Amino acid sequence: MIGKPKFKKGDWVKFEWKGEIIEGEVWVVDAYGTFFQTKEPSYDIFSPKKNMLYKHMEESCVTKIDYKP
């Protein structure tokens, strides 16, 4: 729901990116979406395995994981 994000900074989550499951830590919460997407919160997620920051990942594509990879 816009303005009420499911995840918070520091949560560990996973999502699919180009057919691959990526696990990472939420670094930024955009509670009201972004410039091009205002229907749901989005997140900037850092994956240490890939050494990559994935920006503006929509909440509907993200799932919380209960462990730190």
Regions found by a protein language model. Give the residues of each.
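Mixed-charge, Lys/Arg-rich low-complexity intrinsically disordered regions
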Residues: 1-12
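Intrinsically disordered, low-complexity, charged/polar segments
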Residues: 42-69
